[in-house]
């Protein structure tokens, strides 16, 4: 637990990347589903 000051920065950055990546994948999946429904 010596890296207690450096670790939260990496954790916040990791949470921000996943917080943006997960809705993006879900949004792309919904767009592809709507395109399959329209055709």
From Swiss-Prot:
It is found in: Plastid, Chloroplast thylakoid membrane. It is a single-pass membrane protein. It comes from the Eukaryota. SUPFAM superfamilies: Cytochrome b559 subunits. InterPro entries: PSII_cyt_b559_bsu, PSII_cyt_b559_CS, PSII_cyt_b559_N. Pfam families: Cytochrom_B559. Signal peptide: none annotated. Keywords: Chloroplast, Electron transport, Heme, Iron, Membrane, Metal-binding, Photosynthesis, Photosystem II, Plastid, Thylakoid, Transmembrane, Transmembrane helix, Transport. Heme binds at residue 18. This is Cytochrome b559 subunit beta. It comes from Adiantum capillus-veneris.
């Amino acid at each position: 637990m010596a890296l207690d000051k450096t670790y939260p920065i990496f954790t916040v950055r990791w949470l921000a990347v996943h917080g943006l990546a997960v809705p993006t994948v879900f949004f792309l999946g919904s767009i592809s589903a709507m395109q399959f429904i329209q055709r």
